[in-house]
């Protein structure tokens, strides 16, 4: 009979899924969840429930459990600790056997780990703070199409951060005028210009027209400056097929870089595009539109460091990473923590920076973090110091808002950057002497002097939301 040895009924998750004696394996995917149980639910039961519902468990005992070796496939909550300074919040550590996940699929990884469990009634709130991805799993992903070193070699740009600018107004320009703005910024000294993430293919500017005029602008600026230039042509569309069509056209135009919104576009589409980009020599710029829907709340959702790790696996050469200064938030230590996760090959566990696990990226190419959002020339010393050479500093309004126009705005940013890099290389302290360095440079650059005057009082200061 089917019922032999099968005891129906509901039993506590913690009897099966809370295993404090478990020794984690090198091949396990490890997760750190911030758990807020409902009143009356013990933390062990809450942690075990998370492990169960994100792996093999369901709410009742089922007889088909007997047809598999549950011990081999179940997630295990192996450690729980209270969050200091928070009432009724715990960090629950969960280990998942590698066999639960399809190779090379961020989509499947997230569907398993965060797909179902966040609506669970026994929890008041749940946040995924960090993941440890084992080398065995990382090796099943291509990762970024090119990575930091290959990008520098392609662009022939070394020893400094790269400069970008988002073309504004983001919506409403015709393709010809849009291309004109691109040309002016690149001609003035920027390395890149960028489609705003909202720009896809709207009635006032269809994608193909924009691609053609931007390519023309780029080649003209290259011919005049002798530098390699790029414009992030935004490829997302209503279907993946249409997105690939746009990427293919970008390659036919011979431009160096395309762009994707990886969260709104989805990980499956993003990984397909990343594979195409590596096969065809295109760089891939990633925007994180929609991230704050997922990562803004301190006690529920998913921290951006997890989304950043996932992007490195799925594939992208640049990703927006907040600014530390400017209008979009990012606490300094926490931001630098996930910036290292994007760029470095080996990152040590460091709870003071929000890094819960040591992560070995086994030589997967790195991703350039992009600092953008409400930044201008006065921020240049801080940005150069905080983000270092391997970054893209992106000034939208901070270029196009220059009183003399786009090209002088670009000149001001380039002069400010070169001055900061030179000062740093001479051993000066950018944090302390930053304003002085910018002032000195503005004496021989009227464009920079005008920019300094316009933005001398602008600040976006609010208390940070993201604390440890």
Curated annotation (Swiss-Prot):
Transition state stabilizer (site feature) positions: 327
Q: Which cofactor does it need?
A: Mg(2+)
List, in alphabetical order, the Gene Ontology terms for molecular function in this entry.
magnesium ion binding; monooxygenase activity; ribulose-bisphosphate carboxylase activity
Give the cofactor binding note.
Binds 1 Mg(2+) ion per subunit.
Cite the binding residues for Mg(2+). 194, 196-197
EC id: 4.1.1.39
Question: GO BP, one example?
Answer: photorespiration
Which UniProt keywords are present, listed alphabetically?
A: Calvin cycle, Carbon dioxide fixation, Chloroplast, Lyase, Magnesium, Metal-binding, Methylation, Monooxygenase, Oxidoreductase, Photorespiration, Photosynthesis, Plastid
Q: Which PROSITE patterns match?
A: RUBISCO_LARGE
Q: Its biological function?
A: RuBisCO catalyzes two reactions: the carboxylation of D-ribulose 1,5-bisphosphate, the primary event in carbon dioxide fixation, as well as the oxidative fragmentation of the pentose substrate in the photorespiration process. Both reactions occur simultaneously and in competition at the same active site.
Q: Of which family is this protein a member?
A: Belongs to the RuBisCO large chain family. Type I subfamily.
Q: What else is known?
A: The basic functional RuBisCO is composed of a large chain homodimer in a 'head-to-tail' conformation. In form I RuBisCO this homodimer is arranged in a barrel-like tetramer with the small subunits forming a tetrameric 'cap' on each end of the 'barrel'.
Q: What is this protein called?
A: Ribulose bisphosphate carboxylase large chain
Species of origin reads: Couroupita guianensis
The gene coding this protein: rbcL
């Amino acid at each position: 009979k089917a019922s032999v040895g099968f005891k129906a009924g509901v039993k506590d998750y913690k009897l099966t899924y809370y295993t404090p004696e478990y020794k984690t394996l090198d091949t396990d995917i490890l997760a750190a969840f911030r758990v807020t149980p409902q009143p009356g639910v013990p933390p062990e039961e809450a942690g075990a429930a998370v492990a169960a519902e994100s792996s093999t468990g369901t709410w009742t005992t089922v007889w088909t459990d007997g047809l598999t070796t549950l011990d081999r496939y179940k997630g295990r909550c192996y450690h729980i600790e209270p969050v200091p300074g928070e009432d009724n919040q715990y960090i629950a550590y969960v280990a998942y056997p590698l066999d639960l996940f399809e190779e090379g699929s961020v989509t499947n990884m997230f569907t398993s780990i965060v797909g179902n469990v966040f609506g669970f009634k026994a929890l008041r709130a749940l946040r995924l703070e960090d993941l440890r991805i084992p080398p065995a799993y990382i090796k099943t992903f291509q990762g970024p199409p090119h990575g930091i070193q290959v990008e520098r070699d392609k662009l022939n740009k070394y020893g400094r951060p790269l400069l970008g600018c988002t073309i504004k107004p983001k919506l409403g320009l015709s393709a010809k005028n849009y291309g004109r703005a691109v040309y002016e910024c690149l001609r003035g000294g920027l390395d890149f210009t960028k489609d705003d993430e909202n720009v896809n293919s709207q009635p006032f500017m269809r994608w193909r027209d924009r691609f053609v005029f931007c390519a023309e602008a780029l080649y003209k600026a290259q011919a005049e400056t002798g530098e390699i230039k790029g414009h992030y042509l935004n490829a997302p569309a209503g279907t993946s097929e249409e997105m690939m069509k746009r990427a293919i056209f970008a390659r036919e135009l011979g431009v160096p870089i395309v762009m994707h919104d990886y969260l709104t576009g989805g990980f499956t589409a993003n990984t397909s595009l990343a594979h195409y980009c590596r096969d065809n020599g295109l760089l891939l710029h990633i925007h994180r539109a929609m991230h704050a829907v997922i990562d803004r709340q301190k006690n529920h959702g998913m921290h951006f460091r997890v989304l950043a790790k996932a992007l490195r696996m799925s594939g992208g050469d640049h990703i927006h990473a907040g600014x530390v200064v400017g209008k979009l938030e990012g606490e300094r230590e926490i931001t630098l923590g996930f910036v290292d996760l994007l760029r470095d090959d080996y990152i040590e566990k460091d709870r003071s920076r929000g890094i819960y696990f040591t992560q070995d990226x086994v030589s997967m190419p790195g991703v350039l973090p992009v600092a953008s959002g409400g930044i201008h020339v006065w921020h240049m010393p801080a940005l150069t110091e905080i983000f270092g050479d391997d970054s893209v500093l992106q000034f939208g309004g901070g270029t196009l808002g220059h009183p003399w126009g786009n090209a002088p705005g670009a000149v001001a940013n380039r002069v400010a950057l070169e001055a900061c890099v030179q000062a740093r290389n001479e051993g000066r302290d950018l944090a302390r002497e930053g304003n002085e360095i910018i002032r000195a440079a503005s004496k021989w650059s009227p464009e920079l002097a005008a920019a300094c005057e316009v933005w001398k009082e602008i600040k976006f200061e609010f208390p940070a939301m993201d604390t440890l």
